[in-house]
């Protein structure tokens, strides 16, 4: 009975949104083929979080826009680095992913050995889950619309084709290195 209420659905949205967003990110990488998977997505989210907490505590970052830009920028930079290693150094994606996982777990523990930190005042209400309509739902809706728009692009078609048959994709003139980097 509690789940089928405004508060129940509000709490559900808060709990599942990070998982849905991580799934969107992982799906593109898996679609790239060659047994690609990103084992480090959890530690990467943790890394972004622990560094953000340190930056907030030091007063170096406070604006909601700056926080979102920081989180997205660090995520993109990490994924580009991993993609460049996979594409140009030619290390298997699972090895690169596992190395990133282990590195980030260690770095996260060094940065913050135990849970601590502050939540910005503007974000305090986000975790209450007392209503269905929250900023977390807005983020989920924007991400879902972005996913559907991206699925209509030529890049997405090339990504599906590359995941199905990389050699045929290459012979049809698609720059598979660029598509793989874009997938990350």
Specify the residue positions occupied by each region the protein language model found:
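Interfacial loop-to-helix junctions that mark the boundaries of transmembrane helices
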Residues: 3-14, 60-66, 124-136
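Small-residue-rich segments of transmembrane alpha-helices in multi-pass membrane proteins
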Residues: 18-19, 47-50, 99-109, 171-173
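Helix-loop-helix "hairpin" substructures at the membrane interface of multi-pass membrane proteins
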Residues: 65, 78-81, 131-184
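Single transmembrane alpha-helix segments in multi-pass membrane proteins
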Residues: 6-59
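Residue-level recognition of pore/gate-forming positions within transmembrane alpha-helices
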Residues: 46-50, 75, 101-102, 143, ...
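Membrane-interface helix caps of multi-pass small-molecule transporters
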Residues: 28, 54, 59, 80, ...
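Transmembrane helix-bundle core of multi-pass membrane transporters
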Residues: 89, 93-153, 179-182
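Alpha-helical transmembrane segments within multi-pass membrane transporters and channels
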Residues: 60-101, 144
